Structure formats: structure tokens, C-alpha cells
Amino acid sequence: MRMKRHKIRKKRNPGWYFLLPEFLGVSVFGLIPFADVVRRSFFQTVDGSFVGISNYVQVIKNDAFDLAAKNTLRFVVTCIPCLLLLSLILAMLLQQVLILAEKKKKHRDVTMEQFYRGSAAALKSMYLLPMAIPAASVVVLWKILFDSHGFVNSAIHALSGMNGIGKILSVLLVREVDWMNTDAAFGILVFSYVWKYLGYDIVLWMAGLSAIPQGIYEAAEMDGAGKWKTCFYITLPNLRPVAFTVVILSVLNSFKAFREVYMVAGSYPQENIYLLQHVFSNWFQTLSVDKMAAASVMLAFVIAVFVLLLERSWEREE
């Protein structure tokens, strides 16, 4: 009996060896640097003296940090619901197209099967294309569209000679407008973020939709359930595990919007799009490592609390 237990333990032990490289990688590139950031947040950068929570107090009282935190929160609250809802709708439509293709295949309707599969492939290419575009190319696109001499201003001036809406636009737009330096900049940022990461969320939703057994839908159809009831009582409940992952990854991806804004507007953009990453970048340039460390710890704490609360609410509803 002891020999058998010893053999079982021997078989189980190799699993830890496979996990060891991952654990070392996370420790070296994640846990240890973060621990150093936490340590630096309690010390002054210049002389290395211990200052307690003084850095945290300075960060909270900083007007730039306050503005950036409000803008970032506003950006996340605006973007995430739009992104989740739009990506879910498009993923469900795409899934329906693939289901129709499978039905046509069963009925040996080759022409319609190829049509539906071609449509699905075209849709996939459309929503995955923005993910493949580099940030620098997105910046060029922004400048072409929203610069004072860009496409939007040219289109409005072209319409100004027409009746109706053209006259209204000509009154509102007397001169060329740099849209990235107006209140419209926030809306442009939201639109570009949703456009950029829509395909990422669609892929995640598609993975969840593909995991739902088709037999459930067939049984519901035989029982007389309509499309809406099938959606609310079968599709959405089965997507709950995927929804948790999509929400978390979408929130984390929302912090990547800084690159495009920085390339277009620099370190001090229009107030509506001045995000937390701008504060970190400016503090890094002035070597305010202590403030930057304190702000990073606070941000990590807020994200961790958000994830834990979301996970707990998910578990309660299940």
C-alpha cells in the first residue's frame, strides 16, 4: 500500500516542474517589480528617506491626478458597456450566420452554404482588421479625419453650399476646427477605442457561443420557444462565465487607449482626454518616481477590488 502511494506521489510531482517556469516568469517580471513599486511608494526619491503615506496624500491632492482619474473613470464607464453590448450583438449575428451555413450543408444546398460561409469570413475580416493596424497608423488616420485641414472639415465645407443641413453646418463651423482640441475629442476617443477592440471581444464571445450545445436550441425550438426566449433563457445564462472574462479584459484593455492620444496630442492633450497614463508619463519625465509609485499602487488596488467584487457578485448569482 505504501509503495502504491509513493508511486502516485511520484506521478503527481512532475506537474510542479511544468508550473515552475511560469511561476518564475511571473515572479521576476510581475511580483518582484510590483513589490519594489510598493516599497518606493513609501520613500522619497531624492534622499531615500521614509515618508510613510505622504506620497499617497500628495497624489490625492494633485489636481492633474484628480482630473485624469475622473476622465479615466468616465472613459471606462462609457466605453465598456458600449463595447460589450455591440460586440455581443455582432457575435450572435455571426454565430447565426454560421448556424445557417451548417443547416444549408445538411440540406446539401451548396450555393447558399458558400454564401453564408463567405459572409461569415468577410465579417471576421472586417472586425479583426482594426486589431492588426498599428497605433502609429491609427494616429495617421485620426489626423487625416480630424485635423483642422482634415477630411471632416473638408466634408463640412463641401456641404456648406447646400441647402438645409449644409447651411446649419456653415453657421456652426465658421473656420477650420482641430477636433482633437475640442470637447468632441472624448467622443472621438471612445469611438476609436470601440472600433479598435471590438474584434477582440467578438472573438471571446464567439468562443462562449460555440461552447453552447446546439441540442439545447433544438429542444427549445421543438417546445415552441421563440428567438427572444431562446436568447434570454439559454444563450445569455450560458455566456455568464465568458462574460466575466470579457468584462475584466475589456477594462484592462481600456488603459491602452493612451498610446494613440499621446501620439496625436502629446503630454498635455485637451482636458477631456487627459488620462491617468498622461500623469504617469509626465511624472516619469520629471523623475517623480515616488508619486508615480504611489499612484500605481492605488490604481492596482482599485482594479483588484473591482475584480474581486465582480467575481463575488458572479458567484452569488450562480
Language-model segments: which ranges?
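Short Lys/Arg-rich cationic patches that frequently serve as NLS/NoLS or arginine-rich RNA/DNA-binding motifs
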Residues: 1-9
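A structural signal for multi-pass alpha-helical bundles of membrane permease subunits
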Residues: 8-318
